[in-house]
Amino acid sequence: MSSDAVKKRKPKVIRSEAGTPETKRGRAESEQDVRVYNEEVELEGRDPQQDYTLYKETCAALAKLMSEIQELKTSGAKDGSAEIELRRKQSSIHFITLKKLNRLAHMRLKKGRDQTHEAKQRVDVLHLQLQNLLYEVMHLQKEIGKCLEFKSQHEEIELVSEDEFFQDAPAEISRPQVTREDHHQLTLARLDWELDQRKRLAEQYKTSLSSKEKIQKAIEQKREYLSSLQPGLHNIMQASLPVQEYLSMPFEHMQKQAEVARHLPPPLYVLFVQAGAYGQACDKNLTVSIRGDVDEAKALSRPPEDSQDDESDSDAEEEQQNTKRRRPTVGVQLDDKRKEMLRRHPLSLGIDLKCKDGSVLHLYFYYLMNLNILTVKTKVSTSVDLSGAISAGELLNSESLLNCLYASDHGNETPNPANRYQFDKVGITTFADYVSDLGHPYVWVQKLSGLQFSSDAAQSELSGSALSASHMEKSMKLLRGRLQSRLALHKQFSSLEHSIVPVSSECQHLFPAKVVSGLTRWTMMSHQEFTELSFVQHVLKAGLVSETDLFFKAVVERGTARLLAAVVVNPRYPEVTPLFSLSLLWKGERSGRTDDNLRAMESEVNVFRAELQGPRPGLQLLTNQIQRLCMCLDVYLETESQVSDGSEGPKEFPREKMCLRTARGPSRLKPFKYNHPQGFFSHR
C-alpha cells in the first residue's frame, strides 16, 4: 500500500463530529446506555435460531466482500477507488452486525446462567426442606419405636387366654359387659383372676408339703423293716450253698463278686452294676470283672481326703519328734505329693467286648481317688496276626484307639474343673504328661460311672445310675464300632501298601469296568509332615484338621501324570468322611487352589459320601474314595486337550471313557460323575 493511500485514509479514520472530548464522551455514554437497554428489550423478542441464520449469512457476505476487494486489488484497482470504498463500507456494516450478534449471544448466555443459578437455588432450598422433613420423620419413627418397645411389668406375667378367663372366672371378676368393650379393664380383670388363682395354689402347695412329710415317715418305717430282714436272708443264703455246689449254679460266684463290689468306690460300683445289667439284657458278649487287691481296698475305711489330711498331720508329728532326722528337699516333697494326688484305688474294673470275628477289646477302668475321676486303658486281642501293614501302626495303638469316641473328646485333660487348683498346689502343669501311666480320663468314661461335673451339668439333668444307664448302650456300640472300623482299615491298608485298591462286589457298580490309573504308593505321615505340604494350607486355615487325626499320603499314577493325595482320616471314621487334598504333577504342578477341575475331583471324593459309603456301617468308604480318585484322574487326563507340538503319533492318554460333554461352563469343568448302568460320564 502506498504512502498516498495512507494519507487519504487518515482523515476517514479520525473523522468525528464536532465538539469537545468531554461532550462527545458524555453523549456516547448516554447513547450506549440507551442502546444496552434497547438491546435487552429487543433480546426478549428475538429468535436465537434466526440470529444464528443471520450470523451465517453475514459471515458469508463478509467473506464474499473480502474476496471481491482482493480481486479488485489484484486487478490493479487503487486502494481508494470507489468500488473498494463501497465494499469496505458494506464490510463495516457487516462487522457492526456481527458485533451486535456477539453482544446478544453474551447476553443470552448471561441470562441463561442467571436462570440456571436461580433454578439451582430453588432446588437447593427444596432439597434442604426435604432433608429437614426426612430428619423429622426419622425422629418421629424413633420416638414411635420407643413407645412400641415399652413393656409394662404386667406383660411378663403369663396369663390364661381370654376364652379360658371368661369361661372360668366368676362374673364379679370377669365383668363381661365391661371388659369385652374395654381392653384396659379386661387386662385388669385378668390380673385379678391370676392373683386369685395363685393364692389358691399356694394353699394347695402347703397341703401337699404336709402330706409329703407323712409319706416320708411311712417310707422310713418300711425301710427299717426291710433292713431287719437282712440277717435272715443271709442265713438262708449260707444254708443253700451245698445245693448251689451240687447243681453247679453260679450264685456263689455272683455272691463273691457282689461282696468284692461292696469295696469298689461309688463311680466304679455304678459302672460295674450298669455294665453287668447291660450285658445280661442286651449284649451276651460283654463280660465284667473286678481286678486288684481286695485287702488293700478294705483297709481304705476313710475317705481319701481325710486320710490324706491325717497322713500329713502324722508326718508333721514325726518330724517334730525326730528333730535330728534330715528334712527332705522341696523337690522330694513335691514328688511325694504328686504321687499321693495321682494315687489309684486298689480295685479296678475290666470290661471285655467280643466281636463276631473273634477279636476282643479289653477296657480297664481305674479310679483316681483324690482327683475323683475315672481313667481307661485299652488292649486289643485279635484272632489273626496283624503285623503286616506298616501304615496301620497307629490304628490299634492303645494310646489313640479311643480318641474322639465322642466328638472333641480327646481324653488328654481332666474333665473335673477342681483338679486344676489341685494341680497348681503340687506343680502339675498338665494331666497329659501322666496319661500314658494312668489312662485317659474321657468324658464318656465319667458319664458311664455316673460322674458329672459343672462343665457339662447344664446339658443333662441326670446323675448317678440314671446318667450311666443313659450312655451305656450308645457307648458300647461306639466302642464295638471303633474296633471293627480299625480292624477293617488295618486289612485295607495291607492291600493299599501293595498298590491294590480293594473294592467289594457290593460297590463294583460305582466304578467303570476299566480304571487305568492306579495307586502306586500308600504311606503314613506325621502331623508335622502334613502341615509342610503346600497344597493343604487352605485345609489347615479352615481348621478341618487336628493333631489327633491320622495322616496318609497316596500317589496315583498314569503314564507321565502323577497325582499326590494328602488324606486325613478322622478317629471317628467312618462316621466322619476322610478328607482328600490333591496336587497333580503333569505339565507343571497344579492343585485344587489353582485348577478348577482338581477342585471338582476333591469334591467328588470328599462331598458325595452317600454314593461311596457302601453297605452300612460304611467300612469301605476310604477304599471307594481312592478308587473314585483313580477314575476321576482317568477322566481328567483323557478329556484334557492335547497341545500339539507338530509331531504325528498317538496321544499319551487315548480316550476310553464315554462322556456326553468333555467340558462345560467358563471354568471348563470335566464330567466326573459316573452313571451306572449306562456307563457314561456326565456333569453334576
From Swiss-Prot:
This is THO complex subunit 5 homolog. A motif (Nuclear localization signal) lies at residues 7-10. It comes from Danio rerio (Zebrafish). Its main location: nucleus. Component of the THO subcomplex, which is composed of thoc1, thoc2, thoc3, thoc5, thoc6 and thoc7. Component of the transcription/export (TREX) complex at least composed of alyref/thoc4, ddx39b, sarnp/cip29, chtop and the THO subcomplex. Belongs to the THOC5 family. The gene is thoc5. Keywords: Cytoplasm, Differentiation, mRNA processing, mRNA splicing, mRNA transport, Nucleus, RNA-binding, Transport. Residues 1-32, 296-337 are annotated as: Disordered. Component of the THO subcomplex of the TREX complex which is thought to couple mRNA transcription, processing and nuclear export, and which specifically associates with spliced mRNA and not with unspliced pre-mRNA. Plays a key structural role in the oligomerization of the THO-ddx39b complex. InterPro entries: THO_Thoc5 (IPR019163). Residues 22-32, 296-305 have a biased composition (Basic and acidic residues). GO terms for biological process: cell differentiation; mRNA export from nucleus; mRNA processing; RNA splicing. GO terms for molecular function: mRNA binding. The keyword Cytoplasm applies. It is found in: Nucleus; Nucleus speckle; Cytoplasm. GO terms for cellular component: cytoplasm; nuclear speck; THO complex part of transcription export complex. The keyword Transport applies. Residues 306-320 have a biased composition (Acidic residues).
